[in-house]
Amino acid sequence: MTGLMKAFQKLSPTKRQYAEITQSNSSISSSSSGSKYNDSSSGRYTPLSEEGRTSARASTSTQAQKPASSQQKGGTSSREDEQKLLRKLQTTFGEASNLLNEYVDMRSRKK
C-alpha cells in the first residue's frame, strides 16, 4: 500500500493533499488562524488553501441541513444502507487501486 500512496501523491498537489487527508492516522484541527491539517504521523501542520477552507465550510453547513438517512427513505433500515454504501466504497476503492497500479507500472516502464 505504501507504493500506491507514493504514486498517488506524485500525481498533483491537490491529490497529494487528498491522499494525506485519507490516511487513517490523520486528523483535522482548528486554530485561531483558520483550519489546518494535522498530519499526526510527522507532527507537521500544513495550512489549507483558501479554496479548501471554503469547501470544508460549505460541506459542513450542508450536512447540518440534511435529514437522517432513515427519514429520507422511510422504511429502509440503516443497516441495509450501510451495507450498500460499504459495497460501493469497496468497488470504488478497488477501481482506484487498479488505476494507480497501472499508473505505477506505466511510470516504472518509462524509466
From Swiss-Prot:
Residues 11-23, 56-77 have a biased composition (Polar residues). This is Uncharacterized protein M1. Residues 24-42 have a biased composition (Low complexity). Residues 1-85 are annotated as: Disordered. It comes from the Viruses. It comes from Microplitis demolitor bracovirus (isolate Webb) (MdBV). The gene is M1.
